[in-house]
């Protein structure tokens, strides 16, 4: 396989570094002594590390009255970001967002004109520019990749031509304006392809059509880059999912021969995309397998769980419990530091940098993710709800300040574990508790309880204490709410991240657990997926049941489309079932079977599925109990 050198990428970031240091009297190594947030310098971080931000919303925010401040002084948002050490910006382009109407459909209405405006302003500040082609009139991501309305009903050959022509046009326009992009990505979060349904990766024909479209986009960039300086990227989401990245890029590079790009881009949001250790493994594997540079092109961390408008936010307490960082300014700073450190530590210097996604998206009326709706992102921005720069922005310079000592952060507290149990039944105690450090990093650590299986004879509130090895002077506490309803299912919440208590038959490899917000109602859930047709049963059997009527229930979310999918209960009288019909990611539904009569003390409950290739989803909070 052809391997690219990093010459273009090094030129990209060195130019940004030099220009950024010269602007506005700022210095890359400026003192950060006043910073209130705590982060250590990153050992070995290169001087040319990309510290970027996607700021596509800025024109719309400004048009609607949004203002930005640093230490109480109103300033241009891009100026603040540049002064804080950000050396690159990313701008997304939707082909024709006005195809939805004269005012577009929200999300910044980010057409080429707005992208060019931001790029021009950023270049004037000495910053570099990454152009993100969505090849859609609105958001393109793993869950939706619809072609521009002008390209609807085009076949694969025509779509490849469309991609070439449109990409070439934008490149020519940027060149003519004197703001040639420094980096271009062909498509956005292409897990499942783009330009659906023709270039969707659910068939070999779809993969081929996708590869042809990507190849034409890459060619259009190259044909309009006479100095061969523009870096070319292909970008996926789910940065922790090594199997996804291997299968996608094997198909693109090995099977379809599309290798004329420099960078593999990753989206990594800790509350959706697993652990940083998984991200690191995946990035290093991409370096080994394909010889590409790697960039985390989207990431973000919450600074609060409060809301700045009426729209429910993408990240809240549930996501905080998964992310590994408190939703505080310090937690945001620590999360940003850690993702930069993991990218910086990629082998052979191939980890080139990160882009924070929309740090500018403060709550401004009318600037919602969709027309008529609010902002889901304001608590993930790096400005408060009034537009004041947060101290977490200082991290971009602090990570490179090698004059600062490395500090070992101590444990601040052990968060109480909240547990629900049933009268007269052993309580399922958590195997781990959340340990919070002084820098608002949260680690899940094993706990030893004084009573590992407490049983309580009456409903009420109880506590059990425990210890965490290596954490001196702090006591773990489980706050237990004991209720009358007795859920007989073992490990029905999957909160310990395993399938203990469940019998899986059939295609076992398709079933595991998942620990990401949206895929689980709590910290973890049962999960299923396979790239080929599969079937399985997940069951629990019971004996010694009291005579009476019982209820079985579960919650599910997923893409739907299975051949057969039921919640079932088997008794001596036969089987009862409820058909499960999922309607999308994080769209949870409860399925219930009531009045299950049991007289011989025996029952089996569970999930029965016959699925098609690519079917995916989660099962959580399974209950089986005697009705009162």
Language model regions located:
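Extracellular carbohydrate-recognition regions
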Residues: 39-55, 483-507
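Serine/threonine-rich, repeat-prone extracellular segments and beta-strand-based repeat modules
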Residues: 440-474, 478-479
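Extracellular carbohydrate recognition and processing domains
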Residues: 572-602, 612-614
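Solvent-exposed, low-complexity, repeat-rich "mucin-like" stalks and linkers
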Residues: 407-441
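Aromatic-rich peripheral "rim/lid" segments of glycoside hydrolase catalytic domains that contact
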Residues: 285, 304-338, 342, 346-350, ...
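Substrate-binding cleft and catalytic face of glycoside hydrolase catalytic domains
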Residues: 80-231, 235-239
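Extra-cytoplasmic beta-strand recognition segments
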Residues: 53, 120, 131, 494, ...
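Extracellular glycan-recognition surfaces and repeat-rich motifs
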Residues: 76, 495-527, 531-532
């Amino acid at each position: 396989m052809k391997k690219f050198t990093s010459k273009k990428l090094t030129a990209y970031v060195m130019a940004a570094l030099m220009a950024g240091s010269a602007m506005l009297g700022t210095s890359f190594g400026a003192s950060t002594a006043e910073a209130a947030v705590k982060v250590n310098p990153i050992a070995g971080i290169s001087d040319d590390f990309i510290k970027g931000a996607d700021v596509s919303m800025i024109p719309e925010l400004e048009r609607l009255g949004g203002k930005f401040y640093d230490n109480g002084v109103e300033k241009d948002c891009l100026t603040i970001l540049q002064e804080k050490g950000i050396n690159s910006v990313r701008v997304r382009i939707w082909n024709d967002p006005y195809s939805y109407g004269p005012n577009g459909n929200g999300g910044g209405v980010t057409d080429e004109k707005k992208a060019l405006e931001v790029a021009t302003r950023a270049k004037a500040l000495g910053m570099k520019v990454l152009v993100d082609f969505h090849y859609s009139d609105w958001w393109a991501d793993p869950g939706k990749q619809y072609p521009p309305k002008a390209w609807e009903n085009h076949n694969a050959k025509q779509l490849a031509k469309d991609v070439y022509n449109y990409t070439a046009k934008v490149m020519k326009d940027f060149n003519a304006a004197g703001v040639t992009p420094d980096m271009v990505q062909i498509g956005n979060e292409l897990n499942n392809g783009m330009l659906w349904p023709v270039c969707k990766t659910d068939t070999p024909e779809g993969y081929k059509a996708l590869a042809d479209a990507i190849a034409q986009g890459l060619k259009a960039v190259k044909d309009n880059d006479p100095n061969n300086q523009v870096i070319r990227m292909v970008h996926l989401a789910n940065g922790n999912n090594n199997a996804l990245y291997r299968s996608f890029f094997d198909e693109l590079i090995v099977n379809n021969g599309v290798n004329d790009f420099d960078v593999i881009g990753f989206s990594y949001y800790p509350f959706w995309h697993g652990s940083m250790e998984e991200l690191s493994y995946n990035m290093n594997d991409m370096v080994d397998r394909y010889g590409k540079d790697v960039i985390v092109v989207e990431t973000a961390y919450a600074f609060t769980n409060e809301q700045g408008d009426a729209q429910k936010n993408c990240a809240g307490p549930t996501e905080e419990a998964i992310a590994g960082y408190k939703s505080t300014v310090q937690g945001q700073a620590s999360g940003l530091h850690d993702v930069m450190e993991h990218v910086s530590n990629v082998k052979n210097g191939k980890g080139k940098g990160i882009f924070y996604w929309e740090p500018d998206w403060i709550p401004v009326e009318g600037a919602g993710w969709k027309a008529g709706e609010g902002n889901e992102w304001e608590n993930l921005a790096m400005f408060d709800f009034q537009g004041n720069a947060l101290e977490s922005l200082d991290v971009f310079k602090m990570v490179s300040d090698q004059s600062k000592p490395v500090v070992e952060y101590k444990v601040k507290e052990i968060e109480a574990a909240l547990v629900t149990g049933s009268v007269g039944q052993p309580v399922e105690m958590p195997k781990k508790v959340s340990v919070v450090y002084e820098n608002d990093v949260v680690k899940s650590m094993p706990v030893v309880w004084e009573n590992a299986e407490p049983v309580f004879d009456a409903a009420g509130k109880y506590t059990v204490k425990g210890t965490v090895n290596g954490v001196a002077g702090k006591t773990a506490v489980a706050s237990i709410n004991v209720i009358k309803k007795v859920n007989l299912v073992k490990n029905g919440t999957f909160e310990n991240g395993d399938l203990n208590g469940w019998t899986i038959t059939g295609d076992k490899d398709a079933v595991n657990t998942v620990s990401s917000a949206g895929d689980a109602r709590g910290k973890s859930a049962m999960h299923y997926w396979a790239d080929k047709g599969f079937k399985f049963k997940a069951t629990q059997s019971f004996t010694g049941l009291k005579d009476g009527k019982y209820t079985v229930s579960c919650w599910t979310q997923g893409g739907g489309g299975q051949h057969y999918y039921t919640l079932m209960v088997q008794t001596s009288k036969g089987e009862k079932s409820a058909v499960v019909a999922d309607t999308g990611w994080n769209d949870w539904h409860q399925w219930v079977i009531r009045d299950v009569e049991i007289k011989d003390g025996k029952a089996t409950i569970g999930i029965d599925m016959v699925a098609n290739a690519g079917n995916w989803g989660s099962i959580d909070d399974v209950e089986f109990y005697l009705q009162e």
